[in-house]
Design a protein with these regions (language model features):
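Conserved helicase NTPase motor core
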Residues: 13, 204-310, 317-322, 358-362, ...
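Accessory C-terminal helicase-associated subdomains
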Residues: 210, 521-658
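ATPase/helicase motor core of nucleic-acid motors
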Residues: 378-384, 388-463, 484-558
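C-terminal accessory regions
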Residues: 676-756
């Protein structure tokens, strides 16, 4: 049937996205009115090639229906599973269109949020809400406020069943709301689902099912009354109230006449309702689907339910991959060997094993092989990926240091570390505790010493002048004997925390913190440097730098008393401008952390302002600052210290990532190193939310048992193997140590693969 939507299905890297882009290019060439199709049996396979005149062109049928009526340009909605994939897809589509077509590119959750914000007035009328602009809560704010709202119920539940931490219990409750909303399930049905699915598993959720439903409804109503939105509330508002609204449906049909949805196997169930609404309104669409994808299954995605859209589309099945990979020849053998370990076989040379006794030896041996391959120019670093079921700090640090010692950069994919892991952030938080009253219990001498080192950075120009003076002294053979005069060898200490020398080195900072810092629960303070009995040994530069920090803090305290500092965000900005020179000369990871700190602080005070206005009380500003500091110290707020797309030499880097992040990124490499191949986490790794299977549309309604969990894990492992094999070009190294870091023997499910290969050292 001419003009019907297209459903493109195929394995990993079979060319589905390229097919989608080719369809869009043909739509562009036809002026939005479709191109000529070909006669071919429905649902027949397509062989995708890359040469001109390939099956991509011959098998692509037109999107023939006119996309718009009237004089306005048709709207194009482009959806991708995650933000990074969205950027890549948008770049490729923009190249095809040469910027002549306006594309609205987003993710499903991003689209729901934009629509709820844009049509908030409709929801105000429908739900009888207060007319105020909504504010989206960040996850860290969401958990903090929910904990405060549910305090009595949480205390009662944890008092009766102390097997679960409070933070985890709150997170599970909030995740239930998000799962229900993404699945298109009313909150009122959650207790019934939990009763049927958990079958009274008190250890997992120590709250009565009815009370869980009441708490979720209380939270939802509390947020709506204050104009606060979370992802779970946004998704619920969208599918339950906004999408069925006739005014919205009319506007939606006018805005979008073409839908391009990539990787719909990663989309939530309510996305299908959106797609069907667009199709019913006459929009054309191209969907891509990977039957063995489902990376986000357990995080709100429902690939089986989304696959039902294929019944409304013309199905194009892509068989051959444009680029060869190990999956073409080995996927059946690998999967069979893992699922049936009794089946003995020998794997080809493309699969090699690195076996050691301890994990430390394994990390060193893995790094040695990578270094040798790069130095002998067998492969470029950018073509190597080290993939593990979970990358711990030991593996990340060890591999990064070992490779960096040989000038091989390492890219840690989406390595989101707590903000407080950055010394610069900790120093700024210490500044807050010294300026605002009542925060003395949040600071200690160690934090003060670190602050003195970090914030005594020397300006770039002054640092060069000082270096020149030191060089002159060395050239003339002079040596400074008096540390109180001139610049001593450690007066400008090149701290690893800062790119420029610090005027206060760690030793002097420790002495100053010990002798000049006065702890106090309400007003901790820094005394003059002369309080230190041997202050003459500090040196001129260190004394001056310390005194400048003390005077700056006292100035801010005075201005705070005069109400010249509106909030802590302003104070943080002042500190960054004064001590860190605006952050312009800092490494990227520190700039990223500073940016995330300011964004988190701005959002926190925006929410605080909304709550103060609603509750009509004026609590001390220090109370909000205290909560903010404790929130950061808990490690809830994170920042990605690396750019999305490294540039320069850093772009030619070995990729270090876990399985979930690697599959989500859709990358491919010539060589893959499967780290910790003997780990049980390949089968039982946790990458799903609590009770997620109960919120799939295909759930049977029976209680979820251990057998169901094992079956789901085995299907997940099969998808992982097929996906990784499809992204491996030439070689896979199975990296296995007999003992884990904890000293326990590793007998994971992939051990059958390790045993089927000849160890690398034995070749």
């Amino acid at each position: 049937m001419s003009g019907e939507p297209i459903w493109v299905t195929g394995a990993t890297r079979s060319g589905k996205t390229t097919f989608l882009i080719e369809q869009f290019r043909r739509w562009m060439q036809s002026g939005g009115r479709g191109v000529g199709g070909v006669t071919r049996a429905a649902n027949s396979p397509v062989v995708l090639q890359t040469e001109r005149g390939s099956a991509t062109a011959s098998a692509a049928r037109s999107i023939a229906r006119p996309l718009a009526t009237g004089g306005f340009a048709p709207g194009v909605l482009v959806l991708a599973a995650i933000g990074d994939n969205r950027i890549d897809l948008l770049d490729r589509l923009t190249t095809v269109t040469e910027g002549r077509v306006s594309l609205h590119s987003t993710t499903p959750l991003g689209f729901f949020q934009e629509e709820v914000m844009l049509f908030w007035s409709l929801l105000i009328q429908q739900l009888d809400l207060k007319a105020q602009f909504p504010v989206r809560l960040a996850p860290e704010n969401e958990q903090e406020l929910a904990t405060q709202l549910w305090r009595s119920a949480l205390d009662r539940a944890i008092g009766q069943q102390a097997t679960i931490a409070e933070g985890r219990l709150v997170r599970r409750l909030l995740d239930l709301l998000q799962l229900a909303s993404l699945a298109g399930i009313p909150v009122t049905d959650v207790p019934v689902i939990l009763d049927q699915g958990l079958n009274g598993q008190v250890d997992a959720l120590p709250l009565p099912d009815v009370e869980v439903g009441d708490l979720l409804q209380l939270w939802q109503q509390w947020c709506l009354e204050r104009g606060l939105l979370t992802y779970g509330i946004i998704a619920g508002l969208y599918w339950q109230y906004l999408l069925p609204h006739p005014v919205y449906q009319e506007q939606l049909a006018q805005r979008y006449q073409l839908l391009l949805a990539d990787d719909v196997d990663e989309y939530p169930a309510i996305a299908r309702t959106l797609f069907e609404t667009l199709l019913d309104a006459g929009a054309n669409a191209v969907f891509t689907y990977n039957p063995d994808g489902a990376v986000r299954l357990g995080l709100g995605a429902d690939p089986v339910y989304l696959s039902g859209l294929a019944d409304r589309c013309r199905v194009e099945t892509l068989i051959n991959r444009p680029v060869p990979c190990l999956g073409d020849t080995l996927e059946d053998e690998i999967v069979a060997l893992v699922t049936d370990p009794i089946f003995f076989a020998t794997l080809p040379d493309a699969i090699q094993a690195i076996q050691t006794t301890s994990r430390a030896q394994l990390l060193n041996r893995t790094a040695d092989i990578i270094i040798e391959a790069v130095q002998t120019q067998q492969i470029q670093p950018r073509d190597i990926a080290v993939i593990a079921p979970g990358v711990d700090a030991i593996a990340r640090y060890s591999l990064s240091e070992l490779l960096a010692n040989h000038q091989i950069p390492v890219e840690s994919l989406n390595d989101q570390r707590p903000l407080t892991s950055s010394p610069v952030i900790r120093a700024l938080l210490t500044i807050l505790t010294l300026v605002y009253p009542g925060l003395g219990r949040l600071v200690d001498r160690t934090a003060v010493a670190e602050m003195l080192v970090v914030l005594s950075r020397e300006a770039e120009g002054k640092g060069q002048e000082a270096e020149g003076r030191r060089q002159e002294v060395e050239d003339s053979g002079q040596r400074t004997g008096d540390r109180g005069q001139g610049a001593s060898p450690i007066d400008s200490y090149p701290s690893p925390l800062t790119p420029h020398p610090s005027l206060i080195d760690p030793v002097r900072a420790g002495l100053l913190a010990d002798y000049c810092f006065v702890p106090h629960p309400d007003r901790p303070r820094l005394l003059p440097a002369t309080t230190f009995p041997r202050w003459d040994r500090l040196g001129y530069q260190a004394s001056e730098a310390y005194q400048a920090i003390v005077e700056w803090i006292e100035t801010q305290q005075s201005q705070l008393e005069q109400r010249l500092i509106p909030n802590a965000v302003s104070l943080l900005d002042r500190a960054i401008q004064h001590f860190l020179f605006g952050g312009g000369s800092l490494p990227f990871e520190q700039v990223s952390a500073l940016r995330q700190l300011i964004e988190a602080a701005q959002h926190y005070w925006e929410v605080d302002s909304r709550l103060r206005h609603r509750q009509r009380f004026d609590a001390p500003a220090s109370m909000t600052v205290s909560r903010f500091i404790q929130l950061l110290q808990s490690g809830t707020v994170t920042a990605n210290p690396y750019p999305v797309r490294p540039i320069g030499p850093a772009s030619n880097a070995v990729l270090l990532t876990n399985v979930f992040q690697y599959r989500s990124s859709r990358r491919a490499h010539r060589w893959q190193f499967w780290l910790d191949a003997g780990s049980p986490r390949w089968l039982s790794g946790v990458d799903s939310l609590f009770a997620a299977p109960l919120f799939l549309q295909g759930w049977s309604g029976r209680a979820w048992t251990a057998a169901d969990t094992m079956d789901a894990n085995e299907r997940r492992l099969r998808r992982i193997l097929l996906d990784l094999l499809g992204r491996a070009g030439e070689r896979i190294y199975l990296c296995h140590s007999d003992l884990a870091t904890s000293g326990q023997e590793q007998t994971g499910v992939l051990l059958s693969l390790v045993n089927a290969t000849i160890p690398l050292d034995a070749r």
